[in-house]
Amino acid sequence: MSRANPPSNSSGSRKISFNVSEQYDIQDVVGEGAYGVVCSAIHKPSGQKVAIKKITPFDHSMFCLRTLREMKLLRYFNHENIISILDIQKPRSYETFNEVYLIQELMETDMHRVIRTQDLSDDHCQYFIYQTLRALKAMHSANVLHRDLKPSNLLLNANCDLKVCDFGLARSAASQEDNSGFMTEYVATRWYRAPEIMLTFKEYTKAIDVWSVGCILAEMLSGKPLFPGKDYHHQLTLILDVLGTPTMEDYYGIKSRRAREYIRSLPFKKKVPFRTLFPKTSDLALDLLEKLLAFNPVKRITVEEALKHPYLEPYHDPDDEPTAPPIPEEFFDFDKHKDNLSKEQLKQFIYQEIMR
């Protein structure tokens, strides 16, 4: 292992050290997050361009949990529309193990950057949503909820290939354990959160990811977020401003009495037709959007149904939309016991996962 030539970040104000194998020639910083930095690199033996994600998770249990989920799930899925881990840098020893290096496919940009800088054609919207749903079909068939789908987690390259990334908040859909700990860790961007996440704390289904896809489609169609809430209350207000006050059936579908009382305290709102909000959009796109953004998760379209929707007909191929086997029950064992695990125990889990 070598201390590879450290890249400067864009401001050039500080150096970032990358302790990776000499097989990699580190190039540029391409992204930074709360507990990590991503650099582009060239794998010298093959000439392949890669992304190396350096993570320093060991200061916080939450970062350790996210890193563990990310490593385990990205290794589990082998799918064209889910970012893959090509390699993980093995540490010299447990004692000197302070950083995690994930070597991944290099993608050129992400949906957030693309939406900010250009208008997308209807054809682009179709192809991008199709690929997102194709990835989601694999996740949901494996009983995995992504829980943090948003434009910046959809990576893109010049041929318009799309890959979903960041599985740090993912969890098992099969798990029936109480979700009360879910919100404490749920720092996901509020704008793409399904209304049921804010209205009850008990059960989350695959429908939460479908809602996020609806928000992403709306943003691709208009160039701006559909529900850019400033806080919890504002978020719900924006959703109801568009969808209108829930019907009695949907109202009684809300499990939490407090949430029902809160909705009842709000002024009555009429539904705004999507045609008014998206005047230039095709009828088929709006029809799919309506179905993705159904207020009631029980009535929301499933991923399989969405893939069959006429809007995606140019791309839909039932023989080329693979599923993944359901994750084994013990896969998320560390999550079930997360409140009792020390940072040192989590570090051991991460080390074992890298060395396996």
Curated annotation (Swiss-Prot):
Disruption phenotype: Impairs the formation of appressoria and the ability to infect rice plants, even when inoculated onto wounded leaves. Leads to decreased transcription of the cell surface sensors MSB2 and SHO1. Blocks the transcription of both virulence genes GAS1 and GAS2 during appressorium formation. ATP binds at V30, G31, E32, G33, A34, Y35, G36, V37, V38, K53. Transmembrane segments: none annotated. Belongs to the protein kinase superfamily. CMGC Ser/Thr protein kinase family. MAP kinase subfamily. Residues 24-312 form the Protein kinase domain. Its EC number is 2.7.11.24. Keywords: ATP-binding, Kinase, Magnesium, Nucleotide-binding, Serine/threonine-protein kinase, Transferase, Virulence. Phosphorylated by MST7. Its cofactor is Mg(2+). SUPFAM superfamilies: Protein kinase-like (PK-like). Mitogen-activated protein kinase; part of the MST11-MST7-PMK1 MAP kinase (MAPK) cascade that is essential for appressorium formation, penetration and invasive growth. Central regulator of appressorium development that acts downstream of the cAMP signal. The MST11-MST7-PMK1 MAP kinase cascade transduces signals from the cell surface sensors MDB2 and SHO1 that recognize various surface signals such as surface hydrophobicity, cutin monomers, and rice leaf waxes. InterPro entries: Kinase-like_dom_sf, MAP_kinase, MAP_kinase_CS, Prot_kinase_dom, Protein_kinase_ATP_BS, Ser/Thr_kinase_AS. It catalyses: L-seryl-[protein] + ATP = O-phospho-L-seryl-[protein] + ADP + H(+); L-threonyl-[protein] + ATP = O-phospho-L-threonyl-[protein] + ADP + H(+). The keyword ATP-binding applies. It holds the Pfam family Pkinase. GO terms for molecular function: ATP binding; MAP kinase activity; protein serine kinase activity. One of its GO terms (biological process) is hyphal growth. It comes from Pyricularia oryzae (strain 70-15 / ATCC MYA-4617 / FGSC 8958). It is an enzyme of class 2 (transferase). This is Mitogen-activated protein kinase PMK11.
